[in-house]
């Protein structure tokens, strides 16, 4: 006893307080676990688990109400695949505690407003859907939900707002109807008919210029590539025609109907959609990806038709599972294969279709590409007897439809397939694709196989690739990735610069300094120099050729050796590549040396940009140069260009961030300054203001470079496409060659992959390049891009 009293006297009973805090934290963690895990595998039925959990939460409401409210709002937003489980739980709590139900509805409306304000429109859709399902659980009165949807659809009447804003509010309304349409129509049929009429009127008049840019395939056979709102409208129309009967949504609240129907309902507070502002960023439109139908799995359960609302519900739930668990591939795969009602549908077909729908989504997949590869590998391990066969069937279908597949999606298909093969000993029935051997090498199928084998080599080695494919495929196999050194054999003795190359080789091996290399290069004659030009500073292609060829040849052992060589002789590179022609020639020579090793080319270009040996505009000009025309449609070329653009964008963002931080620091300094005359503060302000001025200049310079890079790229695209179109018109041949398809879709790809940056320069692009006089084929791409956020 005395020990306890001594403790109480000395620290005021703190251990007791800590114990109370610890107990409270444990209880909160326990509540979080119970709420998050409800609906997962359990010995008891879902209904009894929900009833038990409602009892536990009700008992804890007096002490943990705010925590419970916060948790339920969070799961409504983040676990949409368990939507009806949580709405039932809220319904049971509302039946037991009416005030809590009201507070929950208010909290959800607050969260919805915050999500819309923060441009979290995808989460806002789930919140709207959750609120609508609360009508089924007798938490929210149907008339107030109808009034909210009426306000949503009234956005279609707004003037001077982007179409994507109107689209989102229509989508939020339509996508909730599979859950609540029946209940709303029973209670308020006249009002619902009016909302439907307004929706139909809007859908008929909205523009769909953007659709070609977002389609995975240009052909509509065997499956139409429908715009997402058109497809959803058709599904809802069919559902309405079927008297709102759907057979796939889990509705646990039906088991509690006798309890829930006695509960008092809440009216939603009047909800006015927040007005459009300059900062509003709405989701882009989409095109619905279709790959399978009921004929693809004749023996299993029937796959719902493309305009069946069950197809929408299943796909939506699978997308939600991936969204919730994409960071944990094992959990994600397990959740997908244990999907409720899996025995009623061909689940593996749905899973594979949904994963490819995300992987091929334009402009970008929801998650990083490699996630889909690892998820499919995990699914193959979980379902070894069935899923690999469906995946092989899907791969075959994609291969068969390569002729009309969007080039960006072909790139992703190449990257996925090569990575997938590397995890399964590169086993594939290549003979089944031997039809590609008799086709034009530039047509999509042989091109696809060549690119896949090249990517496989990056994940393996050259001889392994030769061993895995039949000898008949040798023409499509990648070249041996060795260095080509033009001064290396006896026949090169007569080449200009040969003797200097030998001297350089000796100097490099002797660990020569930059000055010693300059001394050796000093006497290299300049084929471009006039006899009366004594300056010696003009661009000297031979000097660059001898130096770059010899250095890269001696450093060819590995990436690391090459990087070390660039670093050691950085000063020489910078001097030789001082002019724009010099930078371009360094890239040309590097390409000649490593022509057979695309990966080495990519990493060397990356390193040269980072170390400022070449700039981004030089890389863009090199890619569109005549020297690269033979390789212009190869994947590695476009990977280099996109990597170059990303580097430029990161550079601009980095300086902008530094400027913002400096401005914030100055603002904080002003705030802290006392009323006294503090001269040291003035001095600090002066230093910061100078720094801000310098950073402002750097930002403007970087943005100018960024704009110039895009101008160079688009200008070169316009030039080569115009040349092709004129040539075809002159010769009387078809414009639609494999080269043209690839090139015009690469132009689309630039717009899509960098849309957020390019939108800053739209006025400049429209005034300087994409003018009304431009050929309609090229101008159409720009117009499609403009329509994406119109």
UniProtKB/Swiss-Prot annotation:
Pfam families for the chain: MIF4G, MIF4G_like, MIF4G_like_2
Keywords of the record: Acetylation, Coiled coil, Cytoplasm, Isopeptide bond, mRNA capping, mRNA processing, mRNA splicing, mRNA transport, Nonsense-mediated mRNA decay, Nucleus, Phosphoprotein, RNA-mediated gene silencing, Translation regulation, Transport, Ubl conjugation
Molecular-function annotations in GO: molecular adaptor activity; mRNA binding; RNA 7-methylguanosine cap binding; RNA binding; RNA cap binding
Places the protein is found: Nucleus; Cytoplasm
Gene Ontology process terms (BP): 7-methylguanosine mRNA capping; alternative mRNA splicing, via spliceosome; cap-dependent translational initiation; defense response to virus; histone mRNA metabolic process; miRNA-mediated post-transcriptional gene silencing; mRNA 3'-end processing; mRNA export from nucleus
Modified residues (Phosphothreonine): 21
Region (Disordered): 1-26
Origin superkingdom: Eukaryota
Keyword field contains Zinc: no
CC terms in the record's Gene Ontology section: cytoplasm; cytosol; mitochondrion; nuclear cap binding complex; nucleoplasm; nucleus; ribonucleoprotein complex; RNA cap binding complex
Annotated crosslink Glycyl lysine isopeptide (Lys-Gly) (interchain with G-Cter in SUMO2) location: 684
Motif (Nuclear localization signal): 3-20
The family this protein is said to belong to: Belongs to the NCBP1 family.
Subunit structure: Component of the nuclear cap-binding complex (CBC), a heterodimer composed of NCBP1/CBP80 and NCBP2/CBP20 that interacts with m7GpppG-capped RNA. Found in a U snRNA export complex containing PHAX/RNUXA, NCBP1/CBP80, NCBP2/CBP20, RAN, XPO1 and m7G-capped RNA. Identified in a IGF2BP1-dependent mRNP granule complex containing untranslated mRNAs. Interacts with PHAX/RNUXA, SRRT/ARS2, EIF4G2, IGF2BP1, HNRNPF, HNRNPH1, KIAA0427/CTIF, PARN, DROSHA, UPF1 and ALYREF/THOC4.
Name this protein carries in UniProt: Nuclear cap-binding protein subunit 1
């Amino acid at each position: 006893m005395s020990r306890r009293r001594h403790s109480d006297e000395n620290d005021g009973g703190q251990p007791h307080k800590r114990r109370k805090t610890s107990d409270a934290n444990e209880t909160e963690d326990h509540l979080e676990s119970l709420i998050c895990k409800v609906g997962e595998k359990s010995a008891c039925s879902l209904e009894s688990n929900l009833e038990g959990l409602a009892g536990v939460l009700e008992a804890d409401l007096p002490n943990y109400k705010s925590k419970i409210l916060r948790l339920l709002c969070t799961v409504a937003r983040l676990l949409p695949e368990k939507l009806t489980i949580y709405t039932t739980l809220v319904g049971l709590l509302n039946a037991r505690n009416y005030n809590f139900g009201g507070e929950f509805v208010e909290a959800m409306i607050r969260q919805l407003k915050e999500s819309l304000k923060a441009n979290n429109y995808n989460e806002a859709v789930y919140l709207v859907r959750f609120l609508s399902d609360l009508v089924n659980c007798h938490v929210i009165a149907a008339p107030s939900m109808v009034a909210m949807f009426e306000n949503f659809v009234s956005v279609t009447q707004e003037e001077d707002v982007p179409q994507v804003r109107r689209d989102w509010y229509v989508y939020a309304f339509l996508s909730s109807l599979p859950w609540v349409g029946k209940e709303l129509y029973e209670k308020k049929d006249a009002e619902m008919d009016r909302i439907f009429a307004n929706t139909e009127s809007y859908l008929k008049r909205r523009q769909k210029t953007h659709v070609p840019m977002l389609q995975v395939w240009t052909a509509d056979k065997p499956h139409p590539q429908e715009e997402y709102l058109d497809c959803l409208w058709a599904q809802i129309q069919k559902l309405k025609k079927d008297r709102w009967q759907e057979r796939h949504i889990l509705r646990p609240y039906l088991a509690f109907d006798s309890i829930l129907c006695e509960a008092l309902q809440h009216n939603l507070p009047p909800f006015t959609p927040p007005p459009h502002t300059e900062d509003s960023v709405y989701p882009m439109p989409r095109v619905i990806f279709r790959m399978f139908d009921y004929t693809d799995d004749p023996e299993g359960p029937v796959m719902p038709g493309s305009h069946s609302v069950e197809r929408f519900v299943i796909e939506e739930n699978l997308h939600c599972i991936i969204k919730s668990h994409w960071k944990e591939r094992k959990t994600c795969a397990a959740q997908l294969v244990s999907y409720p009602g899996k025995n009623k549908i061909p689940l593996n077909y749905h899973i594979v279709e949904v994963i490819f729908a995300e992987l091929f989504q334009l402009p970008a997949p929801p998650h990083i590409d490699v996630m889909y590869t690892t998820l499919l590998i995990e699914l193959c391990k979980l379902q070894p007897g069935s899923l690999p066969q469906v995946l092989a069937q899907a791969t075959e279908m994609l291969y068969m439809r390569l002729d009309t597949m969007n080039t960006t999606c072909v790139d992703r298909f190449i990257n996925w397939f090569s990575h997938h093969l590397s995890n399964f000993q590169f086993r594939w029935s290549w003979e089944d694709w031997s039809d590609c051997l008799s086709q034009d090498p530039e047509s999509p199928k042989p091109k696809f196989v060549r690119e896949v084998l090249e990517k496989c080599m990056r994940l393996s080695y050259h001889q392994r690739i030769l061993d895995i494919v039949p000898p008949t495929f040798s023409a499509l196999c990648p070249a041996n990735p060795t260095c080509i050194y033009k001064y290396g054999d006896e026949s090169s003795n007569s080449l200009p610069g040969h003797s200097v190359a030998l001297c350089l080789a000796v100097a490099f091996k002797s660990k020569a300094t930059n000055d010693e290399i300059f001394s050796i290069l000093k006497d290299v004659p300049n084929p471009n120099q006039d006899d009366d030009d004594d300056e010696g500073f003009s661009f000297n292609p031979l000097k660059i050729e001898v130096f770059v060829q010899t250095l890269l040849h001696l450093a060819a052992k590995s990436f690391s050796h090459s990087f070390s060589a660039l670093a050691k002789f950085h000063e020489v590179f910078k001097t030789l590549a001082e002019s724009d022609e010099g930078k371009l020639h360094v890239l040309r020579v590097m390409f000649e040396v490593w022509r057979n090793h695309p990966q080495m080319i990519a990493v060397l270009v990356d390193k040269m940009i980072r170390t400022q040996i070449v700039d981004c505009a030089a890389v863009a000009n090199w890619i569109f140069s005549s020297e690269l025309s033979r390789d212009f449609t190869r994947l590695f070329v476009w990977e280099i260009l996109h990597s170059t653009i990303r580097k430029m964008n990161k550079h601009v963002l980095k300086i902008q961030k530094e400027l913002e931080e400096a401005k914030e620091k100055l603002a904080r300094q002003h705030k802290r300054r006392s009323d006294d005359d503090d001269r040291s503060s003035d001095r600090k302000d002066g230093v910061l203001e100078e720094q801000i001025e310098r950073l402002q200049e750097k930002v403007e310079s970087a943005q100018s470079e960024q704009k110039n890079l895009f101008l160079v790229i688009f200008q070169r695209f316009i030039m080569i496409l115009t040349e092709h179109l004129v040539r075809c018109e002159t010769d009387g041949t078809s414009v639609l060659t494999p080269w043209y398809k690839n090139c015009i879709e690469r132009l689309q790809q630039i717009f899509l992959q960098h849309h957020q940056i390019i939108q800053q320069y739209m006025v400049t692009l429209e005034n300087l390049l994409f003018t009304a006089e431009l050929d309609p084929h090229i101008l159409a791409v720009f117009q499609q891009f403009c329509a994406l956020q119109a």
